[in-house]
Each structure stands twice: as C-alpha cells, then as structure tokens.
C-alpha cells in the first residue's frame, strides 16, 4: 500500500488554515488536525488560558510537542498555529514529514477575519493591525522558506482554495 502524504498548512492568523484544512481533509479523505485544538484537548484549557498562565514561551513548548507528535502520523492535514514557524525544529519537522502549503493573506483580510475573535491572545491589544504587521515581517519569510506551495486566500471561499491546493499538488 502506498504511503499517505501529509499536508501541513502554515500561514498567519486569519488566513483560513483551520477552515481550509477541514475542506481539504474531507476532499482527500484524510484525517484533519488543528494544532491549537490539540493543545486545548491535551491541557483541558483554552489557548488564552495557556498564554495567561505559562506565557507565550510555555505555549510554544506545548505547540512544538503537539506538532512533533502529529507530524509523525501519515495521511493527515494539519493546520498549524501562525507562530509555529518561528521554531526551527518545527520548520524542520514540517519540511521533512510532508507537503507544506503556505496560505497567504493580506493584513487587511487578517484584521477583518480576526477583529471579533477574543481567542487570539496576541491580538488583545489596542492596535491589532500593528501586531499583525510586526508578526508578518518576522513570519512571512519563514512561511516562504518552508513552503512547497503558496496559495492566496483573499476573496476566495475555503472550498475554492482547497480545490486550488489539490490542483497544485496534482492530487
């Protein structure tokens, strides 16, 4: 039996990784995982609580373990956290264990998609746009570094983007 390939979705907050990932997994008959949801299941607490109690460093440690564990599976679609690429170990795991798809979006779209979401600790500030711009400056080159495929998600439905990914991957 042929080995099933993994698809890892990377990109900023609000790019649509979780929504697109669910569509993609369903269309390809693969298992879907979301690293943030997995962290919440393992800790029994939401991401905001983990950030409050353990800080970003504690969250990133948990995230690295979850992604290391999940990326060892075969035949999954994994939606990663936006900041996961800041870890060289995570970038190496993703690159070595599957196809990395960078879901690219503009800051304007990120702001629009995340403005009412209170579950994003890094955006609970007076100027979330500034935070998103600063994060993009740091993270976008890292997404590009490990991406096998780059897909723009602005002004397209999750299903259309999932179809584009399938087409680009030749599945």
Swiss-Prot record:
Coiled coil: none
A GO cellular component entry from the record: cytosol
Entry keyword set: Amino-acid biosynthesis, Aromatic amino acid biosynthesis, ATP-binding, Cytoplasm, Kinase, Magnesium, Metal-binding, Nucleotide-binding, Transferase
Cofactor binding note of this UniProt entry: Binds 1 Mg(2+) ion per subunit.
Gene that this sequence comes from: aroK
Top-level enzyme category: transferase
Annotated EC: 2.7.1.71
Location in or out of the cell: Cytoplasm
Keyword Chaperone: no
Family: Belongs to the shikimate kinase family.
Protein name: Shikimate kinase
Source species taxonomy: Bacteria, Pseudomonadati, Pseudomonadota, Gammaproteobacteria, Alteromonadales
């Amino acid at each position: 039996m042929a080995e099933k390939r993994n698809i890892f979705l990377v990109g900023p907050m609000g790019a649509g990784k979780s929504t697109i990932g669910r569509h993609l997994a369903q269309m390809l008959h693969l298992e879907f995982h979301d690293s943030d949801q997995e962290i919440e299941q393992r800790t029994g607490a939401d991401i905001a609580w983990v950030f409050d109690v353990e800080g970003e460093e504690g969250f990133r440690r948990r995230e690295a373990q979850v992604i290391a564990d999940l990326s060892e599976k075969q035949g999954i679609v994994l939606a990663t956290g936006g900041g996961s690429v800041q870890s060289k170990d995570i970038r190496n795991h993703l690159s070595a264990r599957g196809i990395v798809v960078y879901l690219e979006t503009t800051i304007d779209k990120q702001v629009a998609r995340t403005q009412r979401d209170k579950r994003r600790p890094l955006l609970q500030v007076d100027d979330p746009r500034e935070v998103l711009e600063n994060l993009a400056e740091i993270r976008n080159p890292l997404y590009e570094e490990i991406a096998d495929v780059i897909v723009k998600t602005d002004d397209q439905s999750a299903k259309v983007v999932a179809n584009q990914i399938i087409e680009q991957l030749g599945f």
